[in-house]
From Swiss-Prot:
Lineage: Bacteria, Pseudomonadati, Pseudomonadota, Gammaproteobacteria, Enterobacterales
GO biological process: beta-glucan biosynthetic process
Designated name of the protein: Glucans biosynthesis protein D
Organism: Enterobacter sp. (strain 638)
InterPro entries the record matches: Gal_mutarotase_sf_dom, GH-type_carb-bd, Glucan_biosyn_MdoD, Glucan_biosyn_MdoG/MdoD, Glucan_biosyn_MdoG_C, Ig-like_fold, Ig_E-set, TAT_signal
PTM note: Predicted to be exported by the Tat system. The position of the signal peptide cleavage has not been experimentally proven.
């Protein structure tokens, strides 16, 4: 695992993999224009054609690193790159009256070096035309770009695209595909957050991580009033190729993507990640180590949620560990999983720049049988909010061999809340802090003599109120140490129950402690399962130090 390379990819600041060699795959024919910016000649296209392209491409060697950009683009600063704006009057569907959707393209430059080709597709005739780069499509403003270096560069291509929805057809985008195979979407807050990827390769292995590229896109022309659009894309990398179909529903409160992919392995792959997503967790209620700012919490996502194939619901709060951690949660035919941002209270963040309280959750819903495998979760130490440090994906159990063909179908929900929740009680929040004293008697002059760590897990919903008179039983499992001072408290402000317990070490090990808890009433589970990973301090640090200065 090359951490530097991963961080570059997670920021989508560099396209790190292959060219497509598509020039030999397109013929020339007449075409009836469906977009007035498409200027290429036509070729028949549909999803089966794309699958054949990806299959054939996998039989050839990878095309290698991207070619150099013109110097005026290669040396751009982020500020200069952001100054380049697409001309909204030349958007993909600007000639369609009463359109509800539109598409604009990102310019090449800075870290975005991989040429991406764009095509307009008339689905009625199955004819596609390429949209070639030309400087007239962009406004360069104060970017300092020497446009003379771009003249005659029709094969320069684009870096990616973004989609807009009425009434914000040219001002606030709702979907963005930019860099490698990264893409994002928003809910009704118009606030971007975590990202998804087309594919992850060797994220946590003894070889450098590989970042496949989306190298070409085909856009089906929308009709007036449509709020759904379809785009096809070709994926390429040293180890694999892929044909993808995205049907993107731009609803009022969320964006839903139906994804179909067909994958063709060039090489053996140690670790294949399906439907990967990338997020950031610097600090939160449960992890305060990096929160010495005015902001109580800083994160794009607060938990990994899983709906296992056997019906069990899992809540796993995220961490910012002191060293890289990778966990694999085994499953068979999962019903869904995702990185969620469920805490939407502004007062918990106090951030008017990042607006973390508005960031969307991302939920994956498999649409075919995925078989045996695991949900992989990687957490990387970070000292701030500018680098993504959380990765999540589905890893098939069966190793991928050269020549293998795979297909996965799934839905992605970009929304404030996932489309489904457990009917049982849900985890509301997780907190940790000093332990070893009675709740309500925080140490004053005398600190506890025995060191312990307290955990408070809040549950809401389900049948908690009905279960309370019968008796609620926390079922706690630990990989090491002991749980003591277990308490169950009703908390009126959020109308739920808080489970308290103190973790006491029983040896000097500093290995991560895997914790598991659910609530039971008369033998039946009444809550989803809470999972957590705690990192105990070294034995010589397991003491309380009173560093107060009495004045």
């Amino acid at each position: 695992m090359n951490r530097r390379r991963f961080l570059q990819g997670s920021l989508a600041m560099a396209a790190l993999s292959g060219t497509t060699g598509l020039s030999t795959l397109f013929s020339r024919a007449a075409f009836a224009a469906d977009s007035d910016i498409a200027d290429g000649q036509s070729r028949r296209f549909d999803f089966s054609v794309l699958q054949s392209m990806a299959h054939d491409l996998a039989q050839t060697p990878w095309g290698g690193a991207p070619r150099p950009l013109p110097n005026t683009l290669a040396t751009m600063t982020p500020q200069a790159y952001n100054a380049i704006q697409y001309d909204a009057k030349q958007s993909l569907w600007n000639n369609i009256e009463d359109r509800q959707l539109d598409v604009q393209f990102f310019h090449m430059g800075m870290g975005f070096r991989r040429r991406v080709r764009m095509f307009s597709l008339d689905s009625a005739s199955s004819q596609a035309r390429e949209i070639h780069f030309r400087p007239e499509l962009f406004n360069y403003n104060d970017a300092g770009v020497d446009t003379k270096q771009l003249e005659g560069q029709s094969d320069l291509g684009f870096a990616g695209f973004r989609a807009f929805k009425a009434p914000e057809l040219a001002r606030r985008d709702i979907v963005s595909f930019l860099g490698a195979s990264y893409f994002r979407a928003v809910d009704d807050t118009y606030q971007y957050g975590l990202s998804a990827r087309g594919l992850a390769i060797d994220t946590f292995t003894d070889t450098p991580e590989e970042f496949p590229d989306f190298t070409s896109f085909w856009f089906e022309t929308v009709k007036p009033g449509d709020t759904t659009f379809t785009v096809y894309t070709l994926l390429d990398s040293p180890s694999i190729t892929g044909a993808y179909k995205f049907v993107i529903h731009c609803e009022k409160s969320q964006v839903i993507m139906e994804v179909d992919n067909h994958l063709y392995a060039r090489k053996d792959i140690k670790q294949l990640g399906i439907s990967p997503m990338t997020s950031m967790f610097a600090c939160g209620n449960n992890e305060r180590r990096m929160c010495d700012t005015i902001h109580p919490q800083i994160h794009d996502s607060d938990r990994l949620a899983m709906w296992r194939g056997n019906g069990e619901w899992i809540c796993r709060p995220l961490n910012n560990p002191q060293k890289l951690q990778f966990n694999a949660y085994q499953d068979k035919n999962p019903k869904g999983f995702g990185l969620l941002q469920l805490d939407r209270d502004f007062s918990h963040y106090q951030d008017i720049m990042g607006w973390y309280n508005k960031r969307p959750s991302l939920w994956v819903e498999p649409r075919n049988q995925w078989g045996k495998g695991s949900v992989g979760l990687m957490e990387i130490p970070t000292t701030g909010e500018t680098l993504d440090n959380v990765v999540c994906f589905w890893q098939p159990e069966k190793p991928v061999k050269a020549g293998d063909e795979l297909d996965f179908k799934y839905r992605l929900y970009w929304s404030a809340q996932p489309p489904v929740r457990s009917p049982l009680a849900n985890v509301y929040a997780t907190r940790t802090g000093m332990g070893g004293f009675p709740e309500g008697w925080a140490p004053g002059e005398n600190y506890p003599k025995t060191w312990a760590r307290r955990f408070a897990i809040d549950f809401v919903g389900g049948d908690l109120k009905a279960a309370a008179p019968k008796g609620i039983e926390p079922v706690i499992t630990l990989s090491n140490g002991e749980a003591r001072q277990v308490e169950i408290l009703y908390v009126e402000p959020f109308d739920g129950y808080r489970i308290l317990f103190d973790w006491y070490p029983t040896n000097d090990s500093t290995d991560p402690i895997d914790m598991r808890m659910f609530l039971r009433c008369q033998g039946d589970a009444i809550s989803e399962t809470w999972l957590y990973q705690y990192f105990p301090p070294a034995p010589d640090k397991r003491v309380y130090v009173d560093d107060r200065v009495m004045r």
